[in-house]
Amino acid sequence: MKLTKVALFSLGLFGFSSMALAHGDHMHNHDTKMDTMSKDMMSMEKIVVPVQQLDPQNGNKDVGTVEITESAYGLVFTPKLHDLAHGLHGFHIHEKPSCEPKEKDGKLVAGLGAGGHWDPKQTQKHGYPWSDDAHMGDLPALFVMHDGSATTPVLAPRLKKLAEVKGHSLMIHAGGDNHSDHPAPLGGGGPRMACGVIK
């Protein structure tokens, strides 16, 4: 009789231990899933920048958005743009959070309120997106297809966090960008064609 009671007691302890272990495994799996979900949520964070084609005389026109996201390799800028001129265009972060026109030499200049290329290190040099001695705002050129759309993402390897670019503006210039100040300054790009404030 005593043996039976001892056996039953042992079985009860074993069952309770098994349940506790199973519960522990469940909680561990739950915590792991929560950690994974948190990481996924972080990776889903983004800034959506509304972009307008600049036309001080007739009014600006909405041409889509650029989404900025974090990646292991730097910030990714994904355009969802339309109605732009075909070809390569200079693509930069400018210092001020404005796309307003301003006067220069008695003429109204589109997007001049954005200031110059974002250059927190005061390099005063235009260069490649990965150059340590160039504007932080220098991005890869933006490619616009024949139908006027731009959807190809570009990577800014020196920029890591979304917070870095908030409070500035995103500028698209007419014409390409040779990522140099020679033979023309600031990559030889043309007028400020489209702009969006990064909030």
From Swiss-Prot:
Gene3D superfamilies assigned to the protein according to its UniProt record, in alphabetical order: Superoxide dismutase, copper/zinc binding domain
Signal peptide residue numbers: 1-22
CDD domains: Cu-Zn_Superoxide_Dismutase
Chain's role: Destroys radicals which are normally produced within the cells and which are toxic to biological systems. May play a role in the interactive biology of organisms with their hosts and so contribute to their capacity to cause disease.
Organism: Haemophilus ducreyi (strain 35000HP / ATCC 700724)
Disulfide pairings: 99-195
Family annotation (PROSITE patterns): SOD_CU_ZN_1, SOD_CU_ZN_2
UniProt KW keywords: Antioxidant, Copper, Disulfide bond, Metal-binding, Oxidoreductase, Periplasm, Signal, Zinc
Cofactor: binding comment: Binds 1 copper ion per subunit.
Protein's UniProt name: Superoxide dismutase [Cu-Zn]
